[in-house]
Each structure stands twice: as structure tokens, then as C-alpha cells.
Amino acid sequence: MTQMPQTNARVHAGRMAYHAGLSAEASVIREYESHGYVFEAQRWRGQVGEIDLVLRKSGLVVFVEVKKSKSFERAALRISPTQKRRIFATGEEFVAQEPQGLLTDMRFDVALVDAAGAVQILENALSEG
């Protein structure tokens, strides 16, 4: 049995994580759509950072940070204070393009995906305060 060189192993692990993330995001999109939300953007990139998902419902813009891990608990622990600040700043950058600008109704959710692919939505989980 041959071993992959360490750099190839890292590339492989990175690709696996990337595709697992896309799969988790697709599951989360389906969950939101089943509740009447309209998908707008995936991995929206601003100057400050990236928002995993942007959805809309009745004038509300919902920004979703998707976290995948073996369990919901482990996934929830993967959001750092720095990442939270970046998500808020990027969300504000997104709504600045909206007709109402920063007065746009918005919410910051976290979507957790476990190893079995189950999805748990935590509405307003990243609220400031």
C-alpha cells in the first residue's frame, strides 16, 4: 500500500471538506425552501468576508452560517467571535445594496448539519447583544 505525500493528502482533505460543505449548504437551502424562503445566494463574497447562504422571505433578508460536524453540539462550537463579527459586517455590506439599505429587515441564523445529514436551524442565533 502506498502513502500519499503529505501535500497530496492535504489537497484531498481540502477537496473533501469543500464538497462536504457544499452538500451541507444544499441540505440547508432545501430546509429553508420547505418553509417558504427563497434562495438568493450561496457563498456571497464581500470585501470583509463571506456569507454561506442568503435567503429571503416576506421582505426579510436571512443570512445563514452553515456549520457541519459529527454532532450539532460540535458544529455549534465552531463559530468564533471573530467570525461572528465578520458575518455581521458582510451582512451589512450586502444590505447596503438594498433599496432600504441598513434599514432592511435582516436576521442572522446558524444552520447546523450533523454527520447523518440532519439539519437544525437556529434562527437569530448570531444576534448582536
UniProtKB/Swiss-Prot annotation:
GO terms for molecular function: nucleic acid binding. Transmembrane segments: none annotated. It comes from the Bacteria. SUPFAM superfamilies: Restriction endonuclease-like. InterPro entries: Restrct_endonuc-II-like, tRNA_endonuc-like_dom_sf, UPF0102_YraN-like. Coiled coil: none annotated. HAMAP family: UPF0102. Belongs to the UPF0102 family. This is UPF0102 protein RD1_1191. It comes from Roseobacter denitrificans (strain ATCC 33942 / OCh 114) (Erythrobacter sp. (strain OCh 114)). The lineage of its organism: Bacteria, Pseudomonadati, Pseudomonadota, Alphaproteobacteria, Rhodobacterales.
